[in-house]
Amino acid sequence: YEVEPGDRVPALLLVPEGVDTKSPAPAVVVCHQHNGQWHLGKSEPAGLAGNPMHHTGVALAKLGYVVLCPDALCFEQRRIEQLRGGDYERFEFLRYVVSGKCMAWKNILDIRRAVDYLGTRREVQQDRIGCYGHSMGSTHTWLAGPWEPRFRCLVGNCCLPTYAAIHRTHLLHCFPNFIPGWFQYGDTPDIAGLIAPRALLLNFGENDGGSPIQEVRGGVKTIARAYAAANAADKFNYDIEPGSGHVLSDEMWKRTHQWFQRHLKA
């Protein structure tokens, strides 16, 4: 599907058995991780490659959801021969910066176009669309959430890196996390809080070095205040799993599909 003139996103659409235009189902956009594996994108959540832990798209399809797995910019089929791996990601980030934009802007746009595409599919219940992501995919999820009102329910797994934590720990994080100028107004949890009053679940590992836990604990309080102010305190939940790192544990996945069951299917 086209996201901008001349820019098309390769994606995989998973339609569960028994779902069709006469029996539509809720849908989930699944945003893949980064992990420095630029050769992997949509194929990992779709269950065709990568770590079975992150075959989440096919797992959701087996639970009855229509699932869209797109490639993020710089990954899998959205790479170029001239620049490989992190070089292309750095090039794209700087290209957007000098244009007054950033990769976060581009990722938000692409995800909104993914929802546009789902809007053309009669197999999808149009009022029941969600978003899930792990790691970079989590960042894409809570970044896109405020600007995509068609998302009824969102789940982010293992990624809420605050700029305060990045500066305190001298953490060299991936480019899609950075929005030029934003830190003078707030931090990343303030963005996630704009999703209120729609349903948002965030899972964290206590020992995840990519999201220093000290700032995560403060960040979820910021988000909770935003939900309380929107009279939607029950629509936000989070869990910090003791002893876990940057993973999708069995318990994290259990909370994820229960959240979708509650807010997309119920």
Q: Which ranges hold each PLM region?
A:
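Mobile cap/lid helix-loop segments that gate and shape the active-site cleft of serine hydrolases
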Residues: 94-98, 113, 152-192, 197, ...
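C-terminal catalytic histidine-bearing segment of alpha/beta-hydrolase fold enzymes
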Residues: 175, 222, 227-266
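Short beta-strand/loop motif that positions the catalytic acidic residue
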Residues: 195, 202-204
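Glycine-rich nucleophile elbow surrounding the catalytic serine of serine-hydrolase chemistry
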Residues: 133-145
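Alpha/beta-hydrolase fold nucleophile elbow
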Residues: 122-135
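Acidic catalytic loop of the alpha/beta-hydrolase fold
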Residues: 206-215, 245-247
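Cap/lid segment of the alpha/beta-hydrolase catalytic domain
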Residues: 23-24, 29-112, 119-120, 165-169
